[in-house]
């Protein structure tokens, strides 16, 4: 019996959207929800930007956005695209010619802001460049940069103004027979963002890129993004996400995956389940978890690890994880493997031992997945 049948209260039914591509990455439809970030280097610092793109890709980024504010950045973009392991989205504001240059430089997608890209004639030129160079586009509406006529009409940024901006530019793209586009309606206010995205989801079948813009620093921005994006994703809205933080782009990727993991929408790496610790703990839970999270960052295989300080909840949690450790007494605890009690291990040796067991379990899971893929391939009829 499937997990969905056993636990119907965990089901999330994703909104049906058209599928487009950003380079080789599918967005929308039944594709996995893509996780992306944006570089914060000067684009003209080619080595620094490439290094940041690579770090983001290593952390799991499917797509990376790069700002293109001037001609020198357009020139730099060509080499960045060539060296990037993931598709590059060119972030375009004010100067429509930067969009044309970015398309010609090989960007996989052009993000334009309806609030500052200019009139329809300029947008048409960007559309032509995108079509000629096999680029997709994102209409990126921001509450902080709405068109003047919409602010005059609605008096302030509101969901209606943001959606109207998006729909106006959708019409321009569709009138020019361009359909490889996604939409975003971002604001720094969680309520405003959520309302705009919900209305937009009802108004179009275009894939939606989710984000709470200018969310804040690592802690506050993570909380705000988790609430805003998490609620939308729970409702089935969203095809790609970017967590905007005043922090290292790698942190944005980590938070993005953690949000998706929490909702069961996408899994990557080790999901650590740990207690907050109390006087009952049989070892230092907090320091142990910090050490394990750092040492297990290289694991890409989706799996779970429970680190629980005592026997109140430890054995029960361990039964539901791939690897588990529950604190006991006399300086040792119990190791659980594949949900079963296995053996005791001293607290002193526990961290090294758990890392070893996680790596071993990851290899086992990878082998199982490879075998299943081979069986599926063997069952497919020859063309």
UniProtKB/Swiss-Prot annotation:
It comes from Dinoroseobacter shibae (strain DSM 16493 / NCIMB 14021 / DFL 12). This is 4-hydroxy-3-methylbut-2-en-1-yl diphosphate synthase (flavodoxin). It catalyses: (2E)-4-hydroxy-3-methylbut-2-enyl diphosphate + oxidized [flavodoxin] + H2O + 2 H(+) = 2-C-methyl-D-erythritol 2,4-cyclic diphosphate + reduced [flavodoxin]. InterPro entries: Dihydropteroate_synth-like_sf, IspG_bac, IspG_bac-typ, NO2/SO3_Rdtase_4Fe4S_sf. [4Fe-4S] cluster binds at residues 275, 278, 310, 317. Pathway: Isoprenoid biosynthesis; isopentenyl diphosphate biosynthesis via DXP pathway; isopentenyl diphosphate from 1-deoxy-D-xylulose 5-phosphate: step 5/6. Signal peptide: none annotated. Its EC number is 1.17.7.3. One of its GO terms (molecular function) is iron ion binding. SUPFAM superfamilies: Dihydropteroate synthetase-like, Nitrite and sulphite reductase 4Fe-4S domain-like. Its cofactor is [4Fe-4S] cluster. One of its GO terms (biological process) is terpenoid biosynthetic process. It is an enzyme of class 1 (oxidoreductase). Converts 2C-methyl-D-erythritol 2,4-cyclodiphosphate (ME-2,4cPP) into 1-hydroxy-2-methyl-2-(E)-butenyl 4-diphosphate. Pfam families: GcpE (PF04551). Binds 1 [4Fe-4S] cluster. Keywords: 4Fe-4S, Iron, Iron-sulfur, Isoprene biosynthesis, Metal-binding, Oxidoreductase. Belongs to the IspG family.
């Amino acid at each position: 019996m499937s997990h969905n049948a056993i636990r119907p209260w965990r089901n999330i039914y994703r909104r049906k959207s058209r599928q487009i591509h950003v380079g080789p990455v599918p967005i929308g439809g039944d594709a996995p929800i893509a996780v992306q970030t944006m570089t914060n280097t000067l684009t003209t610092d080619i080595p620094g930007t490439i290094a940041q793109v690579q770090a983001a890709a290593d952390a799991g980024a499917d797509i990376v956005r790069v700002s293109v504010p001037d001609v020198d950045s357009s020139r730099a973009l060509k080499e960045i695209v060539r060296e990037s392991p993931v598709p590059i989205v060119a972030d375009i504001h004010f100067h429509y010619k930067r969009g044309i240059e970015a398309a010609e430089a090989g960007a996989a997608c052009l993000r334009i802001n309806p609030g500052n890209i200019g009139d329809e004639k300029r947008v048409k030129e960007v559309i032509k460049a995108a079509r000629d160079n096999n680029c997709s586009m994102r209409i990126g509406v921001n509450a902080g940069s709405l068109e003047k006529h919409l602010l005059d009409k609605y008096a302030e940024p509101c969901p209606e103004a943001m959606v109207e901006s998006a729909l106006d530019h959708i019409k321009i793209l569709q009138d020019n027979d361009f359909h490889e586009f996604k939409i975003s309606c971002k604001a720094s206010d969680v309520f405003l963002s959520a309302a705009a995205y919900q209305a937009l989801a009802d108004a179009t079948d275009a894939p939606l890129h989710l984000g709470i813009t200018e969310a804040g620093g690592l802690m506050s921005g993570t909380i705000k993004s988790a609430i805003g994006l998490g609620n939308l994703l729970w409702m089935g809205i969203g095809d790609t996400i970017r967590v905007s933080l005043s922090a290292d782009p790698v942190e944005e990727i980590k938070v993005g995956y953690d949000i998706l993991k929490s909702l069961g929408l996408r899994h990557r790496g080790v999901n650590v389940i740990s207690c907050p610790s109390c006087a009952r703990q049989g070892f230092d839970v907090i320091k142990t978890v910090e050490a394990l999270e750092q040492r297990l960052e290289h694991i890409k295989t989706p799996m779970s690890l429970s680190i629980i300080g005592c026997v109140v909840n430890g054995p029960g949690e361990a039964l539901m994880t791939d690897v588990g450790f529950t604190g006991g007494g006399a300086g040792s605890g119990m190791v659980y493997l594949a949900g079963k009690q296995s053996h005791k291990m001293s607290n002193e040796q526990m961290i090294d031992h758990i890392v070893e067991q996680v790596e071993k379990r990851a290899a086992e899971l990878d082998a199982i997945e490879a075998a299943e893929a081979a069986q599926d391939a063997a069952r497919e009829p020859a063309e």
